[in-house]
Amino acid sequence: MPRREDIRSVLILGSGPIVIGQACEFDYSGTQAAKALKEKGIRVILLNSNPATIMTDPDLADATYVEPMTVPVVQKILEKEKPDAILPTVGGQTALNLALACNSAGILEKYNVELIGAKVDAIKKAEDRELFKKAMEKIGVRVPASGLANNLKDAVEIKNKLGLPLIVRPAFTLGGTGGGIAYTEETFEEVVSKGLKASPISQVLLEESVLGWKEFELEVMRDLADNVVIICSIENIDPMGVHTGDSITVAPQQTLSDKEYQNLRDMSIAIIREIGVETGGSNIQFAVNPTNGDVIVIEMNPRVSRSSALASKATGFPIAKIAALLSIGYTLDEIKNDITRVTPASFEPSIDYVVTKVPRFAFEKFPGTDDTLGVQMKAVGEAMAIGRTFKESFQKALRSLEIDRYGFGSDGYFQELLYSRSLNNDQRKEWIDSHLKRPNDKRIFYVKLAFDEGYTVDQIHDLCKIDRWFLWQMEGLLKLEKEYSEKGNSILYKMKQVGFSNRQLSFLKNKKQILDLLDGNLRVDLKKTEIQNLLKLSEEEIEVELGSKKILPVYKRIDTCAGEFEAYTPYFYSSYDEEDESDVTNAKSVMILGGGPNRIGQGIEFDYCCCQASYALQDLGIESIMINSNPETVSTDYDTSDRLYFEPLTLEDVYRIYQNEKPEGVIIQFGGQTPLKLAKDLEKKGVKILGTSPDSIDRAEDRKRFVEVLEKLKLNSPESGIATSMEEAREIAHKIGYPVLVRPSYVLGGRAMLIINEEKELDRYMEKAEEISKDRPLLIDSFLEDAIEVDVDALCDGKEVFVTGIMEHIEEAGIHSGDSACVLPPQTLSKNMMDEIRKATVNLALELQVKGLINIQYAVKNEILYIIEVNPRASRTVPFVSKALGHPIVKYATRIMMGESLKSLPLPKEMEFSQVSVKEVVLPFNKFPGVDTILGPEMRSTGEVMGIASTAGEAFLKSQYMAGDELPSQGTVFVSINDKTKAELLSYIKDLSELGFNLIATSGTHKFLSDNGILSSKINKVYDGIFPTALDYIRENKIHLIINTPLSRVTRDDSFTIRQAAIRFKVPCLTTSNAAKALIKGMVEMKNKGFTIHSLQEIHAMPKIL
C-alpha cells in the first residue's frame, strides 16, 4: 500500500521533561519518527518542552517548538503551521493525553487535522479502563475482576464486593502515578483518594489482586492491511505487584512452554485488532498464574512505550521508526529491515541471545522515603546487557548499573553479609525473610545472601515468588563460585562464559583474606582502601592470566534474524564464545564513552552530548564508536554511531573494546562522571584520552590541587578546609563559622552534600561521610548566604576561550545548580560583574589547558565574585545553552578535540541572544510521599524544561507551565513568608491582589500585609490545631497557589505538612522568594499582553539584541 499523499506535514508531539515513568526513551522514539518522516519528504513540525533532547535540535525537524505542551499552544501551532496530521504515539502518555485533550477541545476538527498512529477511539478503548474491559470480554480474553470508581463511595462498594487486597490503578496516568495496593481497611481510603486525585479524569480501576503471578509483555505491531507481527516477548523476573519499570526484565521470555507462548501471541493479535490500532505499535501486559497457567490481560499501551525502546534495542527492530512509517500509510511488507537490508519489517525478529534489563533507583536522594516497590514506578533509570545465556546477560546487567556491584554479588560489597553475620540465627532468618518478602531495590542481592546462608530454591521462591527457573540459574552461579574457590584459574573460561567480572574473580580468590581483614567490623569503609588495593592488584593478575591463556571476549552482532541473513549494521555485544563478528575496519576512529543508566545528577543531557559528538566525528569523516549500556537513549540507536557496543562502562569492558578496535583515542568528557572515573586507569593502560587531560581534570576536582590553581590566579573562593577525620572537620567548621557546606570530593549531582548549621549536625554527617566519599577527603566550605549563583559554560582550545553562556540562577545559592531555575542572559548582574566573570572563566580554562568544554559555578555576594566549582567537561546545561545560542556547542568541542582551533569555528565574537531563555527543573516528589520539598545542595530533579520569550517574566511563566504546574488565573493564594523576605516581596504580593486573586495569610504575614494596605484574610497555622488551617483549605481545593518561604529549620518543619499537601492535591507551591517574584512578574505580563510562540529556527534567525 503506497504512502498517503494527502499527508504532507505532520506535527509530532514529544513527551516533555524527564520524569519517573517517562524518560529518554521518548527522545529516542521521537527522533526516530522525525527522521523517518523527513526521509519520506514529509515536513516535520515538533512540539516538546525539553531542551535536553536530540529531537529538539533545530536541524532535525523543519519547525521545532520548545513550548508548553498545552492545548492553547497546540492551537497556535495549528493556526501557524497548518499540518495535515498529528502523531501522538511516540511521545508517551504526555503526548496521548494532550492529543485527547485537543480532540475534546474541538481544535482537531476546527483545523481539519487528523490523528495518525492511533485513532481517538482506539486510544480511548485502550486507556479507559471500562472500555478496555468490555473490549476484552467481547473477544473472550479474561481481565482481572474489577470495578470503576469516580469517588470514594463507589470505591467502598467495589471493595465490599471484591475484598482486599485490591490494586488501585488511576486512568490516564504515567508510570502508575497515583496507583497503589490497598492491603487493609486502614489504607484503603488513602490509596483510593490518592488515585482519584492523580487521574486527569478522576477515575480509578479497583482490581482483584494477582500478586505473585508471573508477568509478561509482548510488543506488537499492526498495519492497515491487518498484518500483525510480534516484535519481542519480555518476561519480568519480579512477579506481579511490582511495576514493570521497577522490575528486572528478560527478553525473550524464558519460562513459558511453547504452547503457553503461542497462546499469548494469539491473544495479543486478537487484542490489537479489537482495540483498533492499525498503524503502529502497542505494548500488551499479561499475568500468568504459575500454578495452573491461567492468563489475564492487565493492560495495553496503544503507543510506543518504555518497553518498546527496550524491545528495539534488544532485537535491533526500530519500532518507533516503523510505527511512524505505518502511520502515513505504508504496510509492514513495504518497509525494509535496516539491519539485513533484504528482509521486510513483516519478518518477525528472531534472536539467539538473552537480554536483561535492570532498573536503577535513587532512594538515597530522598531520605525517609519508603523503598518498597509496588504498582507506582520509582526507578529513575535502567541498564541493559546482552549475553549468550541468561547467566551472562544477568551478571553484565548488574555491573552496568554502576552502583559498585560487579555482578550477582561476590564483588567486594559486604554490608548485607556482615550485618547478617552480626545477628543470631533467628534474627538473621527474620531479617533475610523480610527482605525477600517485601519487594525492594536490593532484593536480588538478598536472594544471593539467602543462597549464601543455605536457603533452598523452594524456600526463596515461597518468600519472593520469583520463578524457580530464574532461581535455579542464580543458584548455578553460586555453585560455580564454589568450584572456582576449589579449582582456581583452571576454570577461568567457564567463569567468564557466565558473566563473572574480573572484580568478582578477584574477590573470590581473596575472600578469606578480606573477611579476616574485616573481622566482622560493620564499618567496611574503614578498611575500604586496603580492600580496594588488594582487589585491584588481584584483578590485574587475573587480566594477565586471561591474556596468557588467550581467554578474550568476542563480539557478536545484533542481526534481528539469529544469523539467518547477513547484518550490515555494526551493533555488538561481548561474549566468551567462538566466532568474532566485529570485523574491525582500518578507518580512522574515535571511541565515545556514554553515561550509562540515567540517575539523578546524570541524565539525558549527557546522552545528548555523546550523540552530538558522534555526529561531529561523522561530519569529519571519522568513524565513531559508541559504548553505552542505557536502552532508553538515542546514543544506543544503531544509526547514531558508526559502531555501537552495548556493554557495561567498567574498566575491564571498556579496555577490552579499546584493544579490539584500536581507535585513535577516547572521548570521556561528554558522559558525565561515569567516563571521568575511568580516565586515570585508562590512561595508565596506554589509552589516549582526547581533549582535556586526566591530570587537568584532577587539578579541578581534587580540592587541594584546585586551591593551588585559585591561589595562582588570585581568584576568590569561599573560605574552606579539607578534613580527613571528625576532629579535623570540627576544627575547620569552627574556624570558618557556621553555616558550612560539606561534601565529598569527586561527586556528581551534589551526592552527600549538605548545609550544616551546627556541630551536632556535623557529627551526624561525619558518621556516614567516609563511606560516601570513596576514600577522598571531606570538603568544608563557608556557605555564602544570600549570594547569587551563576553557571558558565565555555569552549577552549588551549589557547583561546569562548564563553557560550552565563546563566543567573533564580534560586539563591545553596540550592544545587541542577535543581535551580536559571535565566540566560542574566537579568540582575552588573556589566562590571559580567566582565569579571568572563575574565575569570578565560583564566581558569587556559590554566587548566582545557580542550573542549568547561563549566564553572560562581557565587556573587556584595559585588565580590567567588569560585564555587570548576568542571572541565560537558555540563548538564550544555543542551540548554546550545538551544538558546543557536550553535551546536558539543560539535564545536569535538572538533577542538580533533585538533581544530576556536578561530576556525563559525562562532560570533561573543555570546548573543535574540530572546530570554529560562531553564526550570522537574522534581519527582509526587513519587516519594513523605519527603520534604525544600531544596538544598543535593540534587533531586529528574528533568528540565525551557521557556523562551522576549522577557524574563514570560519565559519563567512558560517554564512553570512546562514543569507541570497548573497555574491559576484566578482564585486564592496562600501566603506565608519569612521576615527576611517580606519587604522585597511586598510589591509582588500587591500585584497578585491587583490581578484579582484573594489572599489568605498566617498571622505574621497577614499583619504585615494589612500594615501595608493589602487586603488578606487571616488563617490559623497548622500546629495551632484550630480549624480552619491552610491545610484544610488545600484539602477542600480552596487554595490555588502557595507562596511559602520558611527561613529556619523550625519554620520549615512547621510548614512541611503544607508542602506535602500541595504535592498531593496538585497545588503549585513556591518555596523561594526569587521564584515567587519571577512567577508573579510573568503572570502580570501574561495578563497584559498574552503569550507568543516561535520555532527555534525563527528565534535563531532573529536579530541578536541581548
From Swiss-Prot:
Q: In which pathway does it act?
A: Amino-acid biosynthesis; L-arginine biosynthesis; carbamoyl phosphate from bicarbonate: step 1/1; Pyrimidine metabolism; UMP biosynthesis via de novo pathway; (S)-dihydroorotate from bicarbonate: step 1/3
Q: Which cofactor does it need?
A: Mg(2+); Mn(2+)
How the cofactor binds, per note? Answer: Binds 4 Mg(2+) or Mn(2+) ions per subunit.
Keywords in alphabetical order, please: Amino-acid biosynthesis, Arginine biosynthesis, ATP-binding, Ligase, Magnesium, Manganese, Metal-binding, Nucleotide-binding, Pyrimidine biosynthesis, Repeat
MGS-like domain segment(s): 965-1106
What residues does Mg(2+) 2 bind to? 299, 301
UniProt binding sites for Mg(2+) 1: 285, 299
The record's region (Allosteric domain) falls at: 965-1106
Instruction: Quote the protein name from its UniProt record.
Output: Carbamoyl phosphate synthase large chain
Upper lineage is: Bacteria, Pseudomonadati, Spirochaetota, Spirochaetia, Leptospirales
